[in-house]
Regions:
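PLP-dependent class I/II
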Residues: 1-188
Length: 188
């Protein structure tokens, strides 16, 4: 199973590897993709998937009874996004690079926080255990004392207890303010 929803949001002129590059896996491969991230069409519920041939009838039964079909306007918008130029994606990615660099530097400047440079999407996943808090504790304190909403790493796996996830799909001003608020929280 490969979730490739962020396949168009890779930084530094790198390409996201795809399981489609391994023909021997095709009969075991499920790929999920959509318009929500690359074309900023969240909420439109428009996407596509690739399944092994023998699973397609079962998937069709599941989908026809649970989501039926996407409305016509969303389908036409999806076609327009695919047929149109990629200028908007490129502009968005340029902005995300600036925001990524801002949050990366800002997180690493915080006492007890260690963050790797995000390679794609619009999330940073820093380790916060050196602050004296695990990810869940850090998130609660950030919400209540700094007014910053972040997600504990445990939402992404049991081995991520020491981490939190920040989104940098916000303005530079909001990112800077969030970092400043968390810095004040950590240095009280």
């Amino acid at each position: 199973l490969s979730d490739e929803i962020y396949s168009r949001q890779i930084f530094d002129n790198k390409e996201m590897p795809s399981f489609f590059n391994y023909p021997d896996l095709r009969e075991r491969l499920i790929v999920l993709e959509g318009w929500s991230k690359a074309y900023s069409m969240t909420g439109w519920r428009l996407g596509w998937s690739f399944w092994p041939k023998e699973l397609v009838p079962h998937v069709n039964k599941l989908l026809i009874n649970s989501v039926s079909c996407v409305n016509a306007a969303a389908q036409y918008a999806g076609i327009a996004a695919l047929d149109g130029p990629d200028d908007s994606i490129n502009e968005m990615m340029e902005k995300f690079v600036v925001r990524r660099d801002l949050i990366y530097k800002g997180l690493n400047d915080l006492p007890g926080v260690e963050c790797s440079l995000p390679g794609g999407a619009f999330y940073a996943f820093p380790k916060v255990i050196e602050t004296g808090m695990n990810g869940t504790e850090f998130c609660k304190k950030a919400m209540h004392e700094a007014g910053v909403a972040i997600v504990p790493g445990t939402a992404f796996g049991k081995n991520c207890n020491d981490y939190v996830r920040f989104s940098f799909a916000a303005s530079r001003d909001n990112i800077s303010q969030a970092l400043e608020n968390i810095k004040k929280m950590l240095t009280k």
